Amino acid sequence: MNNSNVMIDIETTGTQHHSAIVSVAVAIFDLLTGKIFAEEYIRIRWKEDCKICGGKIDADTFEWWVKQSPEARAELITSDDQLPPDDALMRLFEFIRKHCDGGPVYVWAKSP
């Protein structure tokens, strides 16, 4: 069993490197079969990312968010299950460490 492939999907407030992070979805999977071994969804206090970490909001991306479903737009609403940015990144790191084999980890994602 090869648990070293990690798929990450990040929702942000823009497409640039300085955009605030809204949420992170991560899955550990087998590259050959596509079987998912573990998955996690982490909501982030994106406004805190803006205030403390310098995250930016892109006008075009904001317009995109406004045009999404009510469920998608709800991701932007502050709630108790959102984590501070540093805690969210630590949770992501711990999830990957817990579920991946001891060897190299291969991270997969689609760029904007």
Label every model-predicted segment:
Residues P112:
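Catalytic and binding regions of secreted/periplasmic enzymes and modules that target cell-wall glycans
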Residues N2-V6, E11-A109:
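Conserved non-catalytic scaffold segment of RNase H-like nuclease domains
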